[in-house]
Amino acid sequence: MNFNHFDEQGHAVMVDVSSKQETMRTATAAADVIMSAELLAAIARKSVSKGDVLGVARLAGIMAAKKTDDLIPLSHPLSLHSVSIEFDQDPAACRIQARCTVRAFERTGVEMEAMTGAAVAALTIYDMCKGTDKSISIANIRLLYKEGGKSGLYRREEAA
């Protein structure tokens, strides 16, 4: 397995993408927030004491995706064209899935931006609700979809 984030001496380096072709890059990532049924219902009713949990989490996820290169040491600073955060509430599983989709016309992929956006949206849900439900957990941060660039299309097969 070849890791291109290391030079011949084993030092971490930012990969040189200057010779790569700019193409439209898209990535979608998700993170699951598991909580009590009571808290999930309160979030849906927008009756959590700290306010509109999903509205704040949406903004936090968008902001985080734009700051990825400040957080992940070897990621490239990118000019993002679009960041969206969506939430799917699953009462049967007591879960909210935060999903982040990022698009950019760039020389490198936007997977890390999508993963960062989904993760921070999930962390924000936790932060706004931790006083109500101490058992909240965040699980399964993952890439769902990516396209663009030399490696082409990737789509994760998710169980229904």
From Swiss-Prot:
The keyword Lyase applies. The keyword Lyase applies. Its EC number is 4.6.1.17. Pathway: Cofactor biosynthesis; molybdopterin biosynthesis. Substrate binds at L74, S75, H76, M112, E113. One of its GO terms (biological process) is Mo-molybdopterin cofactor biosynthetic process. Belongs to the MoaC family. Homohexamer; trimer of dimers. This is Cyclic pyranopterin monophosphate synthase. It comes from Trichlorobacter lovleyi (strain ATCC BAA-1151 / DSM 17278 / SZ) (Geobacter lovleyi). The gene is moaC.
